[in-house]
């Protein structure tokens, strides 16, 4: 039997919406990264973008377990000498773009390269409940019901 290899023209992409209210960031990110890559499909091909288009709503209401909300630090560099900056997860979640916590968690689980950048383009994260993708008729995925550890009371 020959090994199956999906062609980009043969891939059919689904639209999935996930409500992140009360979900644990890492558990949500692993599931989203797997679906973005297409590893949940039997037709998965490593060099083809065969994953789903994923919409995450209420990303500002995610939960970090333990003391990570206060202790987890995100670093970035300005490009200037000595320009390393740091922010805690709490300051990002209470700041202007709280959806970046979820975006960074997923981004760091996707391979870095041209295909990874295309796959990250299939992810849309919104801090509130509204999203402009109703025309795509996304199906709802209840991540909290998949495993009792996926959801925490804030």
From Swiss-Prot:
GO biological process: negative regulation of translation; translation
GO cellular component: cytosolic large ribosomal subunit
Keyword Ribosomal protein part of the UniProt annotation: yes
Domain of life: Bacteria
Signal peptide: none
CDD domains registered for this protein in UniProt: Ribosomal_L13
Pfam families: Ribosomal_L13
Disulphide-bridged cysteine pairs: none
Region listing for Disordered, in residue ranges: 132-154
Family designation: Belongs to the universal ribosomal protein uL13 family.
UniProt-recorded name of the protein: Large ribosomal subunit protein uL13
Organism, scientific name: Rhodopseudomonas palustris (strain HaA2)
């Amino acid at each position: 039997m020959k090994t199956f290899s999906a062609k980009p023209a043969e891939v059919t992409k689904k639209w999935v919406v996930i409500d992140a209210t009360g979900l644990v960031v890492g558990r949500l990110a692993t599931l989203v990264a797997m679906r973005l890559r297409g590893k949940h499909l039997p037709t998965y091909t490593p060099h083809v973008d065969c994953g789903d288009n994923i919409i995450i709503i209420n990303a500002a209401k995610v939960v970090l377990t333990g003391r990570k909300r206060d202790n987890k630090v995100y670093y970035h560099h300005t490009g200037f000498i000595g320009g390393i900056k740091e922010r805690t997860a709490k300051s990002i979640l209470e700041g202007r773009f709280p959806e970046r916590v979820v975006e960074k968690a997923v981004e760091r689980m996707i391979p870095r390269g041209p295909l990874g950048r295309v796959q990250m383009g299939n992810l849309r994260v919104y801090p509130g409940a509204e999203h402009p993708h109703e025309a795509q008729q996304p199906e709802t995925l209840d991540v909290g019901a998949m495993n009792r550890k996926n959801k925490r009371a804030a």
